[in-house]
Amino acid sequence: MANISIKIHVIFLFLFFTALYAPFSQEDTEGLSDDSIYAISPPQEEASPDESVYVINSFVFNIDGYTRQFALVNKGDLVTGVEIRGFSNLEKYVQDKTQLLYNERVLDSVNIEYFIGQPREDGKHPVDLVIYVKDTWNIVAIPRPMYSSNSGWDITIKARDYNFLGTMSPLRLDLGYKYDEEGRSSILFMLDSNIPFRFLNLNWNFKFVNDFYYRPDMRLPFYYKNTTGLSVEFPFKQTVITAGFNEDFHLNEENPDSDKALYGDFQEGIFMTSNPYISWKIPFGFEIGQWGELAYTPGINAAFNHEFPGQPLKENRKGPFLNLNHSLGFSRIDWIDNFLRGFGAEIYNSNNTDFSKINIEGQEPFSAYINISGIGHLIIADFFGISARLMYRQWFFTSNDNAGDVLRGILDKDINADLMFSINLDLNFKVLRFKPSIWFNNQNLKLFDFDLHLIPFFDTAAGAFNSQNILLSGGFEVIVFPDFFRSLFLRISLGYNLLDLSIKDNYEIFLGTTLFY
């Protein structure tokens, strides 16, 4: 089995280099010609615009940058043949597509013009859309210190292309030094890429991830993992089926903390993992207000570990492992002037089986997880917004030893739970708009433009619904949004355990480039 896995890995490496060029294929999307030139019918006056039917006929792209057309089509859900009744609904459609593309922070600006043609024989009006986009600056290589009370210091040179090959998907490259919460040092290297491309008129994605650590304080200092995968989307009527396959290579994989007592710190040596998966997104065909379409998505994935001669797998790695999951939800969250606006809700359930434990007395082969969550973002004024998240999580036949991940101010590992209800509340104030490019009417100064947000927050959680089992934390976040570089922002968070300020280390710090939720 290991030899087969190696062959699969070699094939995937070949596909990786092939995929580097695939995004530049002229087979970008239906309705786009090779030279992206479309005949635009002359506009006409509307006799009864509210009764007219408009048909999306074509898309023309005017791109200032290197973003690819197929990426815009995918992100904007741009489909020809869509019928829209009423002129006001046509304008809403154009506004919606403009906002949908602007939500992608790899773009600096988006503008869509539309041209209405003469009625066809069936009385419907063809509509041609001209889409103007300008890329923001997306390439950066900077030393970035990052600190989290949960994982320690991470001082890393981070190279990023947030619009790699114009696919609107990032390429991440890290080289750095880490000092974790247990006082252990390591040198790290990471390469992470997902490359979407069009082939055979289908959407594909190539995944290539490499992680290398040198850990001198550990018994096995060298760690390496490679994941190489390929997935494809198959449209089926109004639904989408996604099928994929990942192949992993592991060297000296560290065991989860929950397994170390029984199986030691490491799975020593080399093993490989084959991971086929499939999911099916089934829209219900109606919108939940303005917050997106309700969709049900079942999925199944499996993991088969392959050992090498002389390097047997430990019991916790033997498997095979099967996961059945499904979700029901909707979401639409927009970026408006560096504030978030929108709402999303989801019910998610995951069920896992470890087949190697089924016939072993005292071993539990099954585990399950359920997550019910809702996230809302509201803009009150141009300087103030409110964000909130409600979440219920429960683990069956197991527990989560990092359940504090929903609380800023309490270390993740300090909370072990098999049930948790949590609420997060953020009060987002824009306290500074630093715009020298506007003040001095000089666009060359846009490099120094930024917005500064100050965000008091409160997080609470309970493992059971009683007043004796409540956790409460709070603090402040500061987020810097550079205008010149929309795809990058810096978040600094400081939170405290508000129920016990007497504890010496009752705080949690985060410095990084991701939002909390």
Task: State each model region's role.
Residues 91, 268, 318-319, 363-365:
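Generic detection of long, well-ordered alpha-helical segments
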Residues 106, 111, 122, 126-336, ...:
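Gram-negative/organellar outer-membrane beta-barrel architecture
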Residues 2, 24-150, 158, 172-195, ...:
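Periplasmic polypeptide-binding modules associated with outer-membrane biogenesis and secretion
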Residues 20-21, 42-49, 397-405:
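Short, charged, low-hydrophobicity "junction" segments
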